[in-house]
């Protein structure tokens, strides 16, 4: 993938860039693997906003991705196409299995049309192959990693991300996350070899607010520029600092939003570096 920069013909195009989509081999998705996707604009069943800054955006269809791959062990698959997916930053690969079934997977870096991938404990260590962690050598970069055996891939699924397998001890494997956190995971959990493709996604300059609106993201307004009725930081004559420690629109202090008693915390060997005091 490469990035194509626009000429500064308008203020919105000045500095803006876009993917050249050179790796895409087909523009229409596999119809049998597409499901309707209905936007809710951040509203719940009562019509109340539960997630702010969402709404609008281009219509999308959901592509069904195989995040498990545990029922195709020993069945080879050929990469038929590399496709664009509007629901994620990574590209997706359409696999044609030898038994006739078609499935989507997240496309790793280096996977191209015509390649053959497989899954199972005896699969080769090459990009796109899916194996249990116990069968992957230490030092290997992997993605689409399960947190629980058979639970489906949860970790390292976005563009350019990868996890390094540091080692294995007893029934656990030590993984270095993209955040720098080191976590232990059951060796029966499966992972896909390689790193996720489309790494240049992080370097795209969106250029204008309108491109964010196309993605369904609405403006995020600071509390200090609101009125007192709308936010605890609102009001005041002229510019103010808010007058208090940062809080949410409902008065709750910022930070420390994670559950300190989460059961899986005991599997964290080293926490990620946050750059803030008190481990927030």
Curated annotation (Swiss-Prot):
Keywords: Ribonucleoprotein, Ribosomal protein, RNA-binding, rRNA-binding. GO terms for molecular function: rRNA binding; structural constituent of ribosome; transferase activity. InterPro entries: NA-bd_OB-fold, Rib_uL2_dom2, Ribosomal_uL2, Ribosomal_uL2_bac/org-type, Ribosomal_uL2_C, Ribosomal_uL2_CS, Ribosomal_uL2_dom3, Ribosomal_uL2_RNA-bd_dom. The keyword RNA-binding applies. GO terms for cellular component: large ribosomal subunit. It holds the Pfam family Ribosomal_L2_C. GO terms for biological process: cytoplasmic translation. It comes from the Bacteria. Residues 37-58, 268-280 have a biased composition (Basic residues). Signal peptide: none annotated. Residues 27-58, 226-280 are annotated as: Disordered. Part of the 50S ribosomal subunit. Forms a bridge to the 30S subunit in the 70S ribosome. One of the primary rRNA binding proteins. Required for association of the 30S and 50S subunits to form the 70S ribosome, for tRNA binding and peptide bond formation. It has been suggested to have peptidyltransferase activity; this is somewhat controversial. Makes several contacts with the 16S rRNA in the 70S ribosome. Belongs to the universal ribosomal protein uL2 family. This is Large ribosomal subunit protein uL2. It comes from Mycobacterium marinum (strain ATCC BAA-535 / M).
């Amino acid at each position: 993938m490469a990035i194509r920069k626009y000429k500064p013909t308008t203020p919105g195009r000045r500095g803006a860039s876009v993917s050249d989509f050179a790796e895409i081999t087909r523009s229409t998705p596999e119809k049998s693997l597409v499901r309707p996707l209905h936007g809710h604009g951040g509203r719940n069943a009562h019509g109340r906003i539960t997630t702010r800054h969402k709404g609008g955006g281009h219509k999308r269809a959901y592509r069904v991705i195989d995040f498990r791959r545990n029922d195709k062990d020993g069945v080879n698959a050929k990469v038929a196409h590399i496709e664009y997916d509007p629901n994620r930053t990574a590209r997706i690969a359409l696999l044609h299995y030898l038994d006739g079934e078609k499935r989507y997977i997240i496309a790793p870096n280096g996977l191209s049309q015509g390649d053959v991938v497989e899954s199972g404990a005896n699969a080769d260590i090459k990009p796109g192959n899916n194996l249990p962690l116990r069968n992957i050598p230490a030092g290997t970069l992997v993605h689409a990693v399960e947190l629980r055996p058979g639970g489906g891939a949860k970790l390292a699924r976005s563009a350019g991300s990868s996890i390094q397998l540091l080692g294995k001890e007893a029934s656990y494997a030590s993984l270095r996350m993209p955040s720098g956190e080191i976590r232990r995971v059951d060796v029966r959990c499966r992972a896909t070899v390689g790193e996720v493709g489309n790494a240049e996604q992080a370097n795209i300059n969106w250029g204008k607010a309108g491109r964010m609106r196309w993605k369904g993201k609405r403006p995020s307004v600071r509390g200090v520029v609101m009125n007192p009725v709308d936010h605890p930081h609102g009001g005041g004559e002229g510019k103010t600092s808010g007058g208090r420690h940062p809080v949410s629109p409902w008065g709750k202090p910022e930070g420390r939003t994670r559950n300190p008693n989460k059961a899986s915390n005991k599997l964290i060997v080293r926490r990620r570096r946050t750059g803030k005091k008190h481990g927030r």
